[in-house]
Amino acid sequence: MNIQALLSEKVSQAMIVAGAPANCEPQVRQSAKVQFGDYQANGMMAVAKKLGMAPRQLAEQVLTHLDLNGIASKVEIAGPGFINIFLDPAFLAEHVQQALASERLGVAKPAKQTVVIDYSAPNVAKEMHVGHLRSTIIGDAAVRTLEFLGHHVIRANHVGDWGTQFGMLIAWLEKQQQENAGEMALADLEGFYRDAKKHYDEDEAFAERARNYVVKLQGGDPYFLDMWRKLVDITMTQNQITYNRLNVTLTRDDVMGESLYNPMLPGIVADLKAQGLAVESEGATVVFLDEYKNKEGEPMGVIIQKKDGGYLYTTTDIACAKYRYETLHADRVLYYIDSRQHQHLMQAWTIVRKAGYVPDSVPLEHHMFGMMLGKDGKPFKTRAGGTVKLADLLDEALERARRLVAEKNPDMPADELEKLANAVGIGAVKYADLSKNRTTDYIFDWDNMLAFEGNTAPYMQYAYTRVLSVFRKAEIDESALSSAPVVIREDREAQLAARLLQFEETLTVVAREGTPHVMCAYLYDIAGLFSGFYEHCPILSAENEEVRNSRLKLAQLTAKTLKLGLDTLGIETVERM
């Protein structure tokens, strides 16, 4: 149920009858304050200006044509021409019943789209580090949300699995006589990478051999391809352990590495030349873009092939967008890549559009994000100043959560404690990130993220168990409530019900904008409203059975909404804490 969409349609119809143009925007929003009702229509200002009349006068005319019978109990004009809408308690009660009768809590499925989501993108022969966390978990929240809404989502893990470094690594593996790279652990590979780079920089004969190996690898030599595959397999096996720990939905089947697009690159360069978009410049092949200027104010040159014949990331990204439209049949493509890559992506996509590889009707969206910072406001590092491995971060999260849970539950059995610590620790790391607006940098702070108060995973997980405890105390089977009516008489009942019925609206925003913090804020709001409702509207000691059962049903919808909402974020819930 999308009440905002329903009201928008009703207000829009009334505005048109009142003389507004057919494409008028009613600007129906959820009200920020309870005294302004549940929703507010703010579109009178802009439309009245076009019509040459006072906004309040237009609002009065709209009200005479606005039919909200059975939806709103009160509609009033506020200030210069805002229309405040107060939902009818009977309407709320009816839709709470409908939400409870549906596994999807009444959430409709929009027109199905094929959506490709590019996220995570670690590099081969390197262990995942904290820099991969944001893309991985924000991207996965988008995947879960869009899949829940019924879209066909294709996960694209754009792994860095190609380039000159592989000649260097294979040469070093050979030098060390590692006959079976498949048995090496990734930690060894990290060391190998450092050693290989050192030799590459210091030993010219080794560097020459590495360069020759790259040529053989790119030429498809079976021996070198086999060595390359081993490096990829070791890396992705290790990364899958991290994905499983993080409770993200990526698997080996989702790997679409840079190497996938290699066969397309010569054809793309040739086609861009044939279209007159790419030209030779100082031996390289370049696309000059009027949309981007260099320091001299001239069109910026984007190199797509170096003078030695090598290709660049831009060339791969052009091929990648083309493949996602032509082969994967994407209706929409989302990229969860940090904000520093924005201009690079925009330039690649400008070329893609000019070349006609992806039509304008298919959005290419850069859902960029900021950096994860330490308490000092600088990029998050180890005490020694090195990069923090993601596995080490998750180990620390688990250890801290284990201590926290044991402190609060000294008698809890070890296996139960471990399960709870995992849900709390991993949930805390993910939620701390997801609850922040992705476009900004955020401070990583263990104390804040593991707190049991505020907008944190432990608080949200506890809020869920608190609602469940009501049913344990009531000693009632939830299914026994199915025939009981919902009756809304108190303000706090109405406020909780109205917010619960905004679940679909919240999902719609997250799906459109790729902003999981909106879902976090919504769920935190629900938890707070339930707390006030629980305190002021007795459930188990209600004045009669009808009120008791009705309030139990509000509690039931609260629990289901919290669980489903947290699931779209990839945050695990527990039944006891």
From Swiss-Prot:
One of its GO terms (molecular function) is ATP binding. This is Arginine--tRNA ligase. A motif ('HIGH' region) lies at residues 122-132. PANTHER family: ARGININE--TRNA LIGASE, CYTOPLASMIC (PTHR11956:SF5), ARGINYL-TRNA SYNTHETASE (PTHR11956). It is an enzyme of class 6 (ligase). It catalyses: tRNA(Arg) + L-arginine + ATP = L-arginyl-tRNA(Arg) + AMP + diphosphate. InterPro entries: aa-tRNA-synth_I_CS, Arg-tRNA-ligase, Arg-tRNA-synth_N, Arg-tRNA-synth_N_sf, ArgRS_core, DALR_anticod-bd, Rossmann-like_a/b/a_fold, tRNAsynth_Ia_anticodon-bd. Monomer. It is found in: Cytoplasm. Keywords: Aminoacyl-tRNA synthetase, ATP-binding, Cytoplasm, Ligase, Nucleotide-binding, Protein biosynthesis. Its EC number is 6.1.1.19. The gene is argS. GO terms for biological process: arginyl-tRNA aminoacylation. Belongs to the class-I aminoacyl-tRNA synthetase family. SMART domains: Arg_tRNA_synt_N (SM01016), DALR_1 (SM00836).
